[in-house]
Amino acid sequence: MQFDYIIIGAGSAGNVLATRLTEDPNTTVLLLEAGGPDYRFDFRTQMPAALAFPLQGKRYNWAYETEPEPFMNNRRMECGRGKGLGGSSLINGMCYIRGNALDLDNWAQEPGLENWSYLDCLPYYRKAETRDVGENDYHGGDGPVSVTTSKPGVNPLFEAMIEAGVQAGYPRTDDLNGYQQEGFGPMDRTVTPHGRRASTARGYLDQAKSRSNLTIRTHAMTDHIIFDGKRAVGVEWLEGDSTIPTRAAANKEVLLCAGAIASPQILQRSGVGNAGLLAEFDIPLVHELPGVGENLQDHLEMYLQYECKEPVSLYPALQWWNQPKIGAEWLFGGTGIGASNHFEAGGFIRSREEFAWPNIQYHFLPVAINYNGSNAVKEHGFQCHVGSMRSPSRGHVRIKSRAPHQHPAILFNYMSHEQDWQEFRDAIRITREIMHQPALDQYHGREISPGVECQTDEQLDEFVRNHAETAFHPCGTCKMGYDEMSVVDGEGRVHGLEGLRVVDASIMPQIITGNLNATTIMIGEKMADMIRGKDALPRSTAGYYVANGMPVRAKKMSRDVN
């Protein structure tokens, strides 16, 4: 089998490339996905409110675990990644957050990455998006990804939480993806007008999969990339339960889009990476790149949970006798509780003046429950998910064997810097202050978790060690740049090799301020033009907010938070 391009991984970036490259009917593409189809009849992946279900099994989740995390009481922590057409966009929380403009401007300060500034990238965010309330300078109106904006009146807790943030002295913003990210406001989400999850399989592949020049293979586990000298010329994979490898040749390029965990694994198995690591497993060295699998980053977060004094939370939706009605409303009308991910309010703030742009993110949820659906509080409640955005901690992904089905050694080194601890202490204390603002007086009861007895630095630190969780945002393991630890250049081409690019969240030099899916899709759109040799979309002229020394908040609070 021969194709112009072979794409490894049908996720948030791979599906973008498959769709854009096959717009030319003379270009042939093979798309390999280790998982299965995105079954449209399976409510677990298609109903937004069911977002916890895919994380509970292994049909749609690789369900990786970390090595014991040394600064987290040696816990082995979850590292869920999407498996199936859509990748992690098939199982994520559907929050459509692009990050802060200064994240991208920060990338663009690196020599050779100048065209990754916010204004260079904004046209590609817009190209990917159809926003339900219409296009403007920041949002698209005819892209493949459906974006739904929170509307007033859905749940009084959303508006109360935003108002409480404003009463605490932080800005209000009407669009976390628009002119000003900093502040509290409604959150966009990747949900269709009919209340279905808007994964990249639905948005992109649905328009491309009928093309004769696109071949899609599911249950195709990539073993390794085939090289002729320093040039990538094909891919070898295993289909289903078969132990007999299948091969295909790439006439132009191999495009690795397997994500921040699997992409470095595949490179290492293919002979690209740290020479010492490859020698441990007798893998012939194709090219030494010590940065492969290094620079691993993530967002860590925790929940602050509160009793809700008014019966307005989603607690009744957790009762089995209410779920048939919720399911029917969603299935037949695309409406009701089932049609939302319920992350409809959030915010970004600076915890201290030293940060030039927000370093803390909030997701508000009108129920008290773990992200994966476990440990639901058996009463009306609500919670804040809060965590730091740009931790200096760095980890790694390293193969444990040559076998493609063997999970790698993953270590994030969460909380390995003093800055991490300071940010989380600040985050807990600020959240408590916000929760005690007048807007929430009629709703908030006792603090369920961590509990008012948890006050000192030592007590807060122990709570974080025992209870903080991943936000499922790994990135950075095939870093874009030109220093000695970078893996790809500014066009995704792997240093020292030909015919091979990496296009996914692994190329982010530094993690962004927010959820990763929207930016991973943008990377796919921008790289698609580079791969095709097309001129980049014209640079945006839209303005964007820079704090530039403005106070973190307008006033200090004097209310007793205990």
Swiss-Prot record:
UniProt keyword terms in alphabetical order: FAD, Flavoprotein, NAD, Oxidoreductase
Classification via PROSITE patterns: GMC_OXRED_1, GMC_OXRED_2
Top EC class for this record: oxidoreductase
An MF annotation (GO) of this entry: betaine-aldehyde dehydrogenase (NAD+) activity
Gene Ontology cellular-component annotations: membrane
Stretches that traverse the bilayer: none
Keyword Transmembrane helix tagged: no
Gene3D superfamilies for this protein: FAD/NAD(P)-binding domain, Glucose Oxidase, domain 3
GO-annotated biological processes: glycine betaine biosynthetic process from choline
E.C. designation(s): 1.1.99.1, 1.2.1.8
Name of one Pfam family that matches: GMC_oxred_N
Pathway: Amine and polyamine biosynthesis; betaine biosynthesis via choline pathway; betaine aldehyde from choline (cytochrome c reductase route): step 1/1
Job description of the protein: Involved in the biosynthesis of the osmoprotectant glycine betaine. Catalyzes the oxidation of choline to betaine aldehyde and betaine aldehyde to glycine betaine at the same rate.
Name by which UniProt lists this protein: Oxygen-dependent choline dehydrogenase
Organism expressing this protein natively: Escherichia coli (strain SMS-3-5 / SECEC)
Lineage: Bacteria, Pseudomonadati, Pseudomonadota, Gammaproteobacteria, Enterobacterales
